[in-house]
Amino acid sequence: MGCTLSAEERAALERSKQIEKNLKEDGVTAAKDVKLLLLGAGESGKSTIVKQMKIIHEDGFSGEDVKQYKPVVYSNTIQSLAAIVRAMDTLGIEYGDKERRADAKMVCDVVSRMEDTEPYSPELLSAMVRLWADSGIQECFNRSREYQLNDSAKYYLDSLDRIGAPDYQPTEQDILRTRVKTTGIVETHFTFKNLHFRLFDVGGQRSERKKWWHCFEDVTAIIFCVALTGYDQVLHEDETTNRMHESLKLFDSICNNKWFTDTSIILFLNKKDIFQEKIKSSPLTICFPEYTGPNSFTEAVAHTQHQYESRNKSENKEIYTHITCATDTQNIQFVFDAVTDVIIAYNLRGCGLY
């Protein structure tokens, strides 16, 4: 008698099984939708990561993209040279050849007329090449931590002949290295390992951060980008604040935020290529006076990594750290593969399916 189910009980059991099945299916669907936030201070490489996703998980840059980035390359190149020229006066550095002053005036005039996005005339290109070869300009470039200069300056200025050619078309690497300040929120969609990613890139400068809060619901994981190179630089928007100190403060507020109690945090210590060169001549103690280790890449990165990871106040939260070079497609492909595996495991655990 106890084993016989009434029609109503059988129907209730069927409904219960169906609900359980639906919940499991919903869990699987939820596990397949991934909302990723790219956060970090200004110029930490967030937008470059977005461009890499386009190369790795979409079809790369279209002919239209290349056309749109061409004036940006022209502008980034001449603006970088103009920034060095302006710093020559500020730092009191003399040109190796006095005749370079006329070339410098030509460059600054083009920038002030807002013609920096135009292809270079043969005269302008020659002036830029002569300037970049000048010993005074090179001395000033080597002191770039004392003023604001794009990371890509050397890359572009070393390629002046190619960029100034009449038939110039930006390469993938040229596009990856372009710098345009992100304003507002940029959303990118792609599919990888059967997951549907929605990646949100939000401007990192102080004025942009108030826009972050709109993105904070239902976040699967945060990728927090840090420019390793910021340890000896000050902010664009506040020249009294060290960039690394600002980034650490920001990481602390994100990592320990109540919104992100159950959110995976992935830390990208970025710009390792530039940092590797910079650390040889600019000591880490500029940012971390307590540091007593050698100014070698491995030890300096390990100390910086510890500074970030020790900000995590939750015993249950793990920080997944990667040392990255956002302009290196192979490196980002490898790292993003590892990041995705973390997300899959984390998601399935959350749904009770792992």
From Swiss-Prot:
Q: Where is this region: G2 motif?
A: 174-182
Write out the catalysed reaction.
GTP + H2O = GDP + phosphate + H(+)
Q: Which GO terms describe its cellular component?
A: cytoplasm; heterotrimeric G-protein complex
Which positions in this protein are listed as binding Mg(2+)?
Answer: S47, T182
User: Positions of the region G1 motif?
Assistant: 35-48
**Catalytic EC class:** hydrolase
What are the start and end residues of every segment in region (G5 motif)? 324-329
Q: Which SMART domains match?
A: G_alpha (SM00275)
Annotated G-alpha domain residues: 32-354
Q: Which GO terms describe its molecular function?
A: corticotropin-releasing hormone receptor 1 binding; G protein-coupled serotonin receptor binding; G-protein beta/gamma-subunit complex binding; GTP binding; GTPase activity; metal ion binding; mu-type opioid receptor binding
Q: Which PROSITE patterns match?
A: G_ALPHA
G3 motif: annotated span = 197-206
Function summary: Guanine nucleotide-binding proteins (G proteins) function as transducers downstream of G protein-coupled receptors (GPCRs) in numerous signaling cascades. The alpha chain contains the guanine nucleotide binding site and alternates between an active, GTP-bound state and an inactive, GDP-bound state. Signaling by an activated GPCR promotes GDP release and GTP binding. The alpha subunit has a low GTPase activity that converts bound GTP to GDP, thereby terminating the signal. Both GDP release and GTP hydrolysis are modulated by numerous regulatory proteins.
Member of which family? Belongs to the G-alpha family. G(i/o/t/z) subfamily.
Report the protein name in the record.
Answer: Guanine nucleotide-binding protein G(o) subunit alpha
Designated gene of the protein: gna0
